[in-house]
């Protein structure tokens, strides 16, 4: 029973990234994270860009690829219980505008971090590993796949 619910979706996780202003809010939050890290006096600019990239990708990995289920009681009979947020988004359809945006944003941040770190080897390796760890689970070939049984239940 959903008393006082204002949406008509069975699972609100499926359409949240299509809400008005969510992409702008996402970009503003990443920019705000970068400004906060820049305000810490003993961090150099390359370290700040690498930290921005790593923190962004870690948060994206946790919220999109680790957390399962829905925060709501949904009338879908628990179908979303074993799915991550990424797998629930846009009803599982691949290559939607929201999925493209969330796939391109870490790449853009990676390119910015690589440029501002002047392609330093240590920063480059950290940023590349961070990018791959968040980009590979987004590929259609990994939809519903649990490597080594991790996050299976």
Curated annotation (Swiss-Prot):
It is found in: Endoplasmic reticulum membrane. Disruption phenotype: No overt phenotype. Simultaneous knockdown of ORMDL1 and ORMDL2 do not exhibit any visible phenotype. Simultaneous knockdown of ORMDL2 and ORMDL3 show elevated brain levels of sphingolipids, compared with wild-type animals, but remain fertile and show no sign of neurodegeneration. The triple knockout ORMDL1, ORMDL2 and ORMDL3 is not viable. It comes from the Eukaryota. The keyword Transmembrane applies. One of its GO terms (cellular component) is endoplasmic reticulum membrane. Residues 1-21, 64-105 are cytoplasmic. Belongs to the ORM family. Ceramides bind to ORMDL3 N-terminus and stabilize it in a conformation that physically restricts the accessibility of the substrates to their binding sites in the serine palmitoyltransferase (SPT) complex, hence inhibiting SPT catalytic activity. In the absence of ceramides, the N-terminus is flexible and permits substrate binding, thus liberating SPT from inhibition. This is ORM1-like protein 2. It comes from Mus musculus (Mouse).
